[in-house]
């Protein structure tokens, strides 16, 4: 078909058709029938206009090309074949000079004699069906429609055919010739059917009776019958101008497209209020580990055994006391809960055989901390129908919080390297295909860059805690089970290491639905003094529980050891996703891989090795108030991983909403940077949608602040 088109049509027509297909992202090598259809339509538009002029008296005359009077005014302005921007410029100019109403869709011609736009149609089907589709799409009495078919039929608005019979006969003859030439080459059947794809069951199967009535009843408003709606859908052009598309959708929609310029966007407004607080399920940069190297004790691998062994490595325990109370809680209960944990661990050690699990005594302090008997009684709705003032209980609007510097510090820390290895290289058999070889090479390079990263530690810690808590919630539903918070890693020298961060005590956990909540109390070791950033620890009661000797360059020094205690809650679905935090590694690897692919396609060879081994090259990491931050490929890997991990740790409806809405603004800004001249409508509504997600979540507030930095530097 492509060869036929190039032989059959004028090279100028072919070139214009190629440009049109490129503009709409279509491949003429694949869409060959469409290529032929565009060329045919262009040629008919040119033939419609050819030889038609207006003389000094304003009459329409037909003049051959070699006639000396060819300088007369052309009767028709050709709009089809121009690029969209130029075509709309011509249409606007005509409307301004003639007073014609601006069409919603680009027409093909303008007739200066009749003062009207013309839409030309060339169809391989019945002319009246195609005419109906065009009329339904355009919905304008000011645009004249003229349809030609390959069988010599034609149809025009009000049977007004505009041209003289000889000019129309020339067009019909040309279309018939094209059909014959296609048929001779065996191309016609495919071309004829491609206008609406292959023949469908609906075309052969008449809908009647009840189904027909149901179809007519199910139509959207403003459609009287199924045929009208079908014609409208078939004539709906996805790449038409936006205003036209909107007006097609509903008569009530009247969007004015505003140009989006460098001066258009304003910064996102962050909320005012007290500073935001830490809301992760476990401590991040402030966590302290009690560790044992090369564990070989009896029961190694059983969490309770490992925890007791780690506790024995510390000798600086002292009488605990509260250094930062929780403003709304009964703080002595938190203190008593920690003392109870110490006492019950001591009881275990005195036993002959250490049990595999430990259920805490149901003391008053634990009952309070775990919300035992605090839930309102559930009553069957049927028993309440007669209560006159039955209503849902009032809930307060969340208090707005401002961005605080601690969350940026947390993120920076998550990107850093630790002195331990948190993930192993997977043992995989021999590669059998080149693609597997490249994939495993990329994975190995990536693993080497992130295996020491603190964000990877958070992944392993999160996986362990969520797995242990979900298991205990199912296995010991009524018990207050003590769950050690443990992780495992290797030292740089390859020695195994078991770490204890603290303990969790689980409350009652009859979790029937995914969203049913299990309460727990977390008790985590730390060297961070909470009085330095009290706002960060709003939800915590912090105890001082010991003194730790630390080795430094100037010798040994003693630092107070703190215990961060809080009541928290989670659900089956949250624990299920927490158990799958390793997915963060995969997500960030895929992002790195897309960067490698982009580089490889430019260089036309796989660039994996160069990408990771060229240590001198820097890559953009993100935006800050200083501008675009750059770093090594390893830093890029760790930053992408940290972002993915924080999306998991701080998952919330606020984050979902902000990500979805800010992405729309981001795409418009990127279109502006790419000189695509974007337009917007209701930009204020988009800002409103973004800003209603900025309430109190620290990670969302930080992302909004980063977005503002991006706006500042992107639009310079």
Curated annotation (Swiss-Prot):
Name of protein: Polymerase acidic protein
Disulfide bonds: none
Binding site for Mn(2+) 2: 80, 108
One Gene Ontology term of the molecular function aspect: endonuclease activity
Annotated InterPro entries: INFV_PA (IPR037534), PA/PA-X (IPR001009), PA/PA-X_sf (IPR038372)
Cell location: Host cytoplasm; Host nucleus
Modification note: Phosphorylated on serines and threonines by host kinases, including human casein kinase II.
Residues that, per the record, bind Mn(2+) 1: 41, 108, 119-120
Enzyme Commission designation: 3.1.-.-
Role of this protein: Plays an essential role in viral RNA transcription and replication by forming the heterotrimeric polymerase complex together with PB1 and PB2 subunits. The complex transcribes viral mRNAs by using a unique mechanism called cap-snatching. It consists in the hijacking and cleavage of host capped pre-mRNAs. These short capped RNAs are then used as primers for viral mRNAs. The PB2 subunit is responsible for the binding of the 5' cap of cellular pre-mRNAs which are subsequently cleaved after 10-13 nucleotides by the PA subunit that carries the endonuclease activity.
Subunit-structure text: Influenza RNA polymerase is composed of three subunits: PB1, PB2 and PA. Interacts (via C-terminus) with PB1 (via N-terminus).
Keywords, in A-Z order: Cap snatching, Endonuclease, Eukaryotic host gene expression shutoff by virus, Eukaryotic host transcription shutoff by virus, Host cytoplasm, Host gene expression shutoff by virus, Host nucleus, Host-virus interaction, Hydrolase, Inhibition of host RNA polymerase II by virus, Manganese, Metal-binding, Nuclease, Phosphoprotein
First-tier enzyme category under EC: hydrolase
Originating organism: Influenza A virus (strain A/Port Chalmers/1/1973 H3N2)
GO CC terms in record: host cell cytoplasm; host cell nucleus
Cofactor: Mn(2+)
Gene expressing this chain: PA
Example GO BP: symbiont-mediated suppression of host mRNA transcription via inhibition of RNA polymerase II activity
Positions of short motif Nuclear localization signal 1 (NLS1): 124-139
